[in-house]
């Protein structure tokens, strides 16, 4: 959406309600009602739309939509998947989330699940690092979705 479309499309409502898995566990983004084309040569001002708790903080202040708003929402979704619930207040505990990836993995995991194997733990830590990098306060410090998908 961000890199393969011209002009780029910003979804503006990436959340656990707008992503479904198919039978092969491949994710599909739904609900493009709030999507917006990003025009490089004009203002990308936007009204505030999206699901509470997933909206990038800068959108509330600047009302300017960028691809990095979707990246932030994706970071929230990643942590929600790992934790088993929306990270909510957990996000406000850390001024710079990417510097706190040294958190104990068991503090982040869904407590309803069994302790994962070492291989799975390594993958979960990688996912946490990606999720935290997507939540950087400065939108320019967030990765692109193209980098996230690698």
Predicted regions and their residues:
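Protein kinase catalytic-loop region centered on the HRD/HxD motif
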Residues: 2-9
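Cytosolic eukaryotic protein kinase-like domains
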Residues: 25, 29-150
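Iron-sulfur cluster-binding cysteine motifs and their immediate structural context
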Residues: 22
